[in-house]
Swiss-Prot record:
SUPFAM superfamilies: Ribosomal protein L30p/L7e (SSF55129). Keywords: Ribonucleoprotein, Ribosomal protein, RNA-binding. PROSITE patterns: RIBOSOMAL_L30 (PS00634). It comes from Drosophila melanogaster (Fruit fly). NCBIfam families: uL30_euk. Pfam families: Ribosomal_L30 (PF00327), Ribosomal_L30_N (PF08079). Binds to G-rich structures in 28S rRNA and in mRNAs. Plays a regulatory role in the translation apparatus; inhibits cell-free translation of mRNAs. PANTHER family: 60S RIBOSOMAL PROTEIN L7, LARGE RIBOSOMAL SUBUNIT PROTEIN UL30. InterPro entries: Ribo_uL30_ferredoxin-like_sf (IPR036919), Ribosomal_uL30 (IPR039699), Ribosomal_uL30_CS (IPR018038), Ribosomal_uL30_euk (IPR005998), Ribosomal_uL30_euk_arc (IPR035808), Ribosomal_uL30_ferredoxin-like (IPR016082), Ribosomal_uL30_N_euk (IPR012988). CDD domains: Ribosomal_L7_archeal_euk. The keyword Ribosomal protein applies. This is Large ribosomal subunit protein uL30. Transmembrane segments: none annotated.
Amino acid sequence: MPAPVVKKPAAKKLPAVPESKLKFSKKQISKRVAESKRRLKKAAVIALRKKENLVRAEKYQNEYIKAEQREIKLRRLAKKRNQFYVPAEAKLAFVVRIRGINKVAPKVRKVLQLFRLRQINNGVFIKLNKATINMLRIAEPYITWGYPNLKSVRELIYKRGFVKHNRQRVPITDNFVIERKLRQAHQIQCVEDLVHEIFTVGPNFKYASNFLWPFKLNTPTGGWRKKANHYVNGGDFGNREDQINRLLRKMV
């Protein structure tokens, strides 16, 4: 007698996935892949920039050391020959406003506006030439200024540096703040580039200094004591030459 035929249960059909859902899933996967590629590319660019910035910083440091050694050598040579060593004329000044606007002459007010010194204890870097030296003389009773060294320039930018972005005052928190504004047109992509351009008064000094927001400094310990007197007479205003660096130690 033949064995009874056992019917196999029909396989359950999976519900069909709507075409719209399949398209959406495919789109999401494509988005994730694109985002992943974008992140990898960005990480590679950041790594490259970091490497470039380290190379630049090292190059600048060597340049500063060589310049200092050359200066020392020239001083020693002059001393050996019983001569006076005359250093090169300063190209860079740092200017600080020390007085308010009461009874300010229109010419003085205009100079202070051009220098962007709108408040007491505001400071800016200025390229020294015939025009700016004349402007400094006009505004002299309201400002003090001098020749900043590398340490002062660095401390000002690293500790007190703010830049202009979309008309806003933005702190220098990383190199990207500088790169997005100055890299393409002016080859300045990191803080050390900015320090170098300012300190050496490079070809892009105008753009670098205008990019920096005027520095807001502390009042020096004890305050401004003799604003009405020139620095050479024991007062506060006027050219301090290299002694501006001592003042900046108290204000940064």
